[in-house]
């Protein structure tokens, strides 16, 4: 709607800022320093509105503190590391039409550039420049001298230095472990290697070996091994492919999908395929009870989960019960767990209520949880097992809680050599960026960062208490993640990035090289290109001979050391909520390892997600909303507000035109209003009530805005700045025929400066109508720039309350008033009661206690009235008398004009001679007159 208007102004001032080097920051001991950072972005795509939310949230705070007199450093860098860039380049090289069309239509990459992006380094460089331009376009106040990429040779040496330190400390280890793995690319994966940025979560499943007929065996995965006693059949999927594999000298039947997955975990050999028609001709033997089990096929078995073979316990699983009924054969049900909450055969009870698969899943999960936490193993189990097992079963399983019985059942299965475990991706399916499904794989001699090291983990948990986390609820979430931290693989066999110095076949993965890079912001712009690790020992740890190193590198290392010591630690780290799962804990861990608690970030600010069309942004949903597109459509400053100030910090927001357009309209109205008011030229010198009132109101708003910004309540701050001040100015011009030029000019100066962190371009344009300086470097307004006039606030608030009450009465009677009758109550008795109520409110005496100490019937109503007043007004009323009638008379013309009535009559409610219209006299209270409309 106004995008051209906003953008022309924005690009004009961005050029001026860059020309004047406004945001280039150097050491300055005369000011308090503030070092603020955001995560550097992957350069495999343009910036989207999700990036924008985090980055602009940080920029607003950086701009605010700069105007508060801080020496603010806000740097930026770019991450080329990892598989995202490589995966996209590979897709383009393969000619994948959907990727290429997405690049052209959504990312707006020119056709003649597509071919060039087959080279991953050129792709990364292309999007680096695009991102840098977008960051500038959105108004980020960055010191661009300090930028770098993760392919910078200085960054490579830095990572070698960092990993060397971790290795010396014993935090880098090699061992065998199970990790999420891409079969196609041949390396372990983490969150940033997967489509949708999903961290693979690996869980263990129990496996029980069943002997079968014709020399076949069945490998059965289960989450409920204790129900082996009640198994009446085995189940396979009715139309999936199955295979026979050789494992530990025996032939086992599993699904083909399971084999493809388990071959990365187990030493299995494919023997042959087998049809489900042949499988159901076989039978199996329950290894605990000796019962002969039929093999049945149905649609309820997931061939991709576990082994694709399921043991059927219909008494306790509604899907199993339903599957058995669909065979149209008689079957036995053996309940082996009992609870007070569930029926004896909960699987049957669920099916009798519904056969809807979604509803049955809820029943299944409820049964599982109830039996696990509240269930006991039934005595009947003892009669189901052979004699040689009876003693163990009696002592360790019968009558035991399910939680204990499960452990003991597993021990029994192990002793019979029929137990095994497999690994599953519990939050799968998850796909690598190359398109392959991620599988669990046991990796031999893999390098890991030992985030599960007990001493290191304990230090990290302790450190969290010394870091301010905003909003506070994220602290518990972070503590839980650190508590559950496990080893993380450090290397990848392919991708872009730094090679492990002791194993050049491995490339350091993207989460492992993004934990300490904020150190580099302090010095990289003054560092020579050709350096060795020893330079970092001196700059960051103070180790080494400065003069010898200076001769070697030709650089003033003492100055670099001083700059590091000046800026570090990071005062405020901004990030999106997704990175609390990995980057933030890793960031804390690595700082602790090398520096102890000395250089931990002082504060971490975490914001929620941005959704488009009500859903998370995803290439598959084709709802990626690039930041450059948003700027073109709506304009820079409206987008800044929309992304940061329309929801609470941790709350997700849905970005769309209905969100941004009203903001753009209001900003344009504000611009036009200020532009018009700046041209006002009047001779009014006296300070009238209306002038005192608007000064007091704006003073109060500025105090609230300052508090809101420092507590990251941007939405509240913006509501005050965009709407409250605007409405107050409108009310002011209703109150006065001729404005006070000096007062208005002062308020406009304050308003423009207050807006500057949020909408810096509009603010800069307006500011230059009254000054030649940059508003970005001006002083942020303080409340004490304006005086407080409680009597003026009280007077105008009183008048506005009358107007509000009249409007409400008109709505009730559905009629426009022609005459207004106002009853006021100013008796000495009521005034004294009001002062007593004010004292009670100020002393935080509860209403019940206050009314208990007085017999006055209106005490409660008076208490409620004064409790709604600001403290400054309450304090004023304690020491000053007000004349309500005089206030109304003084503002009579304004009231008549605003209400559009022909007559306003004022009555003293204590005067027995005045009429009691509609019985309203008795309802008049101090500061709360009774009103009648006719």
Curated annotation (Swiss-Prot):
* The keyword Transcription belongs to this UniProt entry's keyword annotation: no
**Which GO biological process entries does UniProt record here?**
leucyl-tRNA aminoacylation
Question: Which reactions is this enzyme annotated as catalysing?
Answer: tRNA(Leu) + L-leucine + ATP = L-leucyl-tRNA(Leu) + AMP + diphosphate
- EC number(s) on file: 6.1.1.4
GO molecular function terms here? aminoacyl-tRNA deacylase activity; ATP binding; leucine-tRNA ligase activity
Residue window of motif 'HIGH' region: 41-51
| GO CC terms, sorted | cytoplasm
Subcellular location(s) of the protein: Cytoplasm
In this chain, ATP is annotated as bound at 619
The sequence motif named 'KMSKS' region is recorded at 616-620
Q: Which UniProt keywords apply?
A: Aminoacyl-tRNA synthetase, ATP-binding, Cytoplasm, Ligase, Nucleotide-binding, Protein biosynthesis
The record's listing under Pfam families reads: Anticodon_1 (PF08264), tRNA-synt_1 (PF00133)
Its primary localisation, in coarse terms, equals: cytoplasm
Kindly give the Gene3D superfamilies that the UniProt entry links to this protein. Class I aminoacyl-tRNA synthetases (RS), HUPs, Isoleucyl-tRNA Synthetase, Domain 1, leucyl-tRNA synthetase, Valyl/Leucyl/Isoleucyl-tRNA synthetase, editing domain
Family, as annotated: Belongs to the class-I aminoacyl-tRNA synthetase family.
What is the name of this protein?
Leucine--tRNA ligase 1
Specify the species. Answer: Saccharolobus solfataricus (strain ATCC 35092 / DSM 1617 / JCM 11322 / P2)
């Amino acid at each position: 709607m106004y995008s051209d208007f906003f953008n022309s102004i924005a690009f004009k001032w961005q050029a001026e800022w860059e020309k004047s080097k406004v945001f280039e920051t150097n050491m300055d001991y005369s000011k308090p320093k503030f070092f603020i950072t955001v995560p550097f972005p992957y350069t495999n795509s343009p910036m989207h509105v999700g990036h924008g939310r985090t980055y602009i949230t940080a920029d607003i705070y950086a701009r605010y503190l700069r105007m508060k007199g801080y020496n603010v450093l806000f740097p930026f860098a770019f991450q080329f590391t990892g598989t995202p860039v490589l995966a996209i380049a590979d897709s383009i090289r393969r000619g994948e039409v959907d990727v290429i069309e997405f690049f052209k239509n959504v990312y707006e990459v020119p056709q003649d550039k597509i071919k060039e992006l087959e080279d991953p380094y050129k792709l990364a460089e292309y999007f680096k420049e695009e991102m840098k331009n977008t960051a500038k376009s959105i108004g980020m106040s960055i010191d661009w001298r300090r930028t770098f990429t993760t392919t910078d040779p200085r960054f490579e040496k830095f990572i070698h230095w960092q990993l060397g330190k971790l290795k010396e400390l014993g935090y880098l280890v090699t061992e065998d472990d199970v990790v999420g793995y891409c079969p196609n690319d041949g390396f372990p994966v983490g969150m940033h290697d997967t489509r949708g940025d999903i961290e693979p979560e690996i869980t263990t499943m129990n496996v029980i070996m069943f002997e079968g007929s014709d020399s076949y065996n069945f490998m059965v995965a289960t989450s409920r091994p204790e129900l082996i006693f009640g198994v009446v059949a085995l189940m396979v999927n009715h139309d999936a492919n199955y295979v026979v594999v050789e494992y530990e000298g025996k032939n086992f039947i599993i699904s083909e999908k399971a084999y493809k997955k388990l071959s990365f975990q187990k030493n299995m050999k494919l023997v042959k395929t087998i049809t489900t028609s042949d499988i159901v001709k076989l039978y199996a033997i329950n290894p605990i009870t000796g019962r002969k089990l039929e093999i049945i096929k149905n649609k309820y078995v997931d061939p991709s989960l576990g082994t694709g073979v399921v043991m059927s316990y219909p008494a306790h699983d509604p899907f199993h019960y339903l599957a058995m009924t669909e065979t149209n054969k008689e079957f036995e049900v053996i309940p082996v767990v009992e609870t007070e909450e569930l029926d004896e055969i909960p699987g049957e009870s669920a099916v009798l209520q519904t056969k809807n698969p979604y509803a049955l899943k809820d029943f299944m999960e409820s049964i599982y949880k109830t039996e696990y936490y509240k269930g006991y193993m039934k005595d009947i189990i003892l009669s189901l097992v052979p004699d040689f097992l009876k003693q163990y079963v009696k002592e360790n399983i019968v009558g035991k809680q399910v939680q204990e019985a499960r452990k003991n059942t597993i021990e029994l299965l192990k002793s019979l050599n029929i137990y095994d475990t497999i690994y599953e991706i519990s939050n799968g399916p998850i796909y690598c960026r190359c398109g392959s499904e991620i599988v669990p794989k046991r990796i031999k001699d893999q390098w890991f960062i030992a985030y599960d090291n007990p001493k290191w983990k304990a230090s990290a948990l302790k450190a969290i208490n010394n870091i301010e986390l905003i909003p506070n609820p994220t602290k518990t979430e972070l503590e839980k993640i650190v508590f559950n931290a496990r080893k993380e693989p450090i290397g990848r066999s392919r991708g872009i990035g730094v090679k492990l110095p002791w194993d050049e076949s491995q490339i350091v993965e993207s989460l492992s090289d993004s934990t300490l890079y904020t150190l580099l912001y302090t010095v990289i712009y003054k560092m020579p290109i050709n350096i060795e690790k020893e330079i970092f020992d001196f700059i960051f740890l103070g180790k080494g001979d400065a003069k010898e190193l200076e001769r070697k590198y030709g650089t003033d290392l003492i100055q670099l050391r001083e700059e590091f010591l000046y800026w570090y630690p990071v005062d405020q780290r901004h990030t999106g909520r997704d990175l609390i799962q990995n980057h933030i804990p890793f960031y804390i861990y690595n700082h602790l390892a090398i520096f102890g608690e000395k250089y931990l970030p002082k504060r971490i600010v975490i914001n929620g997600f941005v959704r488009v069309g009500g859903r998370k942004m995803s290439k598959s949903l084709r709802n990626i909303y690039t930041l450059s597109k948003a700027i073109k459509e709506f304009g820079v400053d409206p987008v800044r507000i929309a992304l940061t100030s329309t929801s609470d910090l941790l709350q997700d927001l849905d970005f769309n035109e209905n969100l941004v357009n009203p903001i753009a309209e209001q900003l344009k109205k504000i611009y036009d209003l200020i532009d018009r008011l700046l041209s006002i030229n009047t001779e009014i010198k006296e300070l009238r009530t209306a002038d005192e009132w608007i000064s007091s109101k704006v003073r109060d708003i500025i105090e609230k805005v300052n508090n809101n910004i420092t507590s990251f309540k941007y939405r509240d701050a913006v509501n005050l700045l965009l709407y409250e001040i605007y409405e107050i100015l409108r009310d002011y011009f209703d109150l006065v025929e001729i404005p006070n030029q000096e007062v208005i000019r002062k308020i406009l100066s304050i308003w423009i400066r207050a807006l500057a962190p949020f909408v810096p371009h509009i603010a800069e344009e307006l500011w230059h109508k009254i000054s030649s300086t940059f508003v970005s470097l001006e002083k942020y307004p303080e409340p004490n720039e304006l005086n407080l006039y409680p009597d003026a606030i009280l007077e105008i608030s009183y008048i506005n309350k009358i107007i509000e009450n009249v409007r409400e009465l008109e709505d009730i009677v559905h009629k426009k008033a022609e005459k207004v009758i106002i009853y006021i109550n100013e008796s000495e008795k009521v005034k004294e009661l009001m002062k007593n109520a004010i004292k009670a409110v100020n002393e935080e005496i509860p209403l019940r206690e206050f009314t208990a100490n007085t017999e006055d019937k209106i005490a409660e109503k008076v208490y409620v009235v004064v409790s709604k007043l600001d403290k400054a007004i309450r304090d004023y009323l304690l020491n000053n008398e007000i004349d309500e009638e005089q206030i109304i008379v003084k503002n009579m013309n304004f009231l008549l004009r605003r209400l559009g009535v022909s007559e306003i009559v004022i009555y003293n409610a204590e005067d027995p001679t005045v009429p009691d219209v509609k019985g309203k006299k008795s309802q008049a209270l101090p500061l709360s007159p009774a009103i009648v409309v006719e």
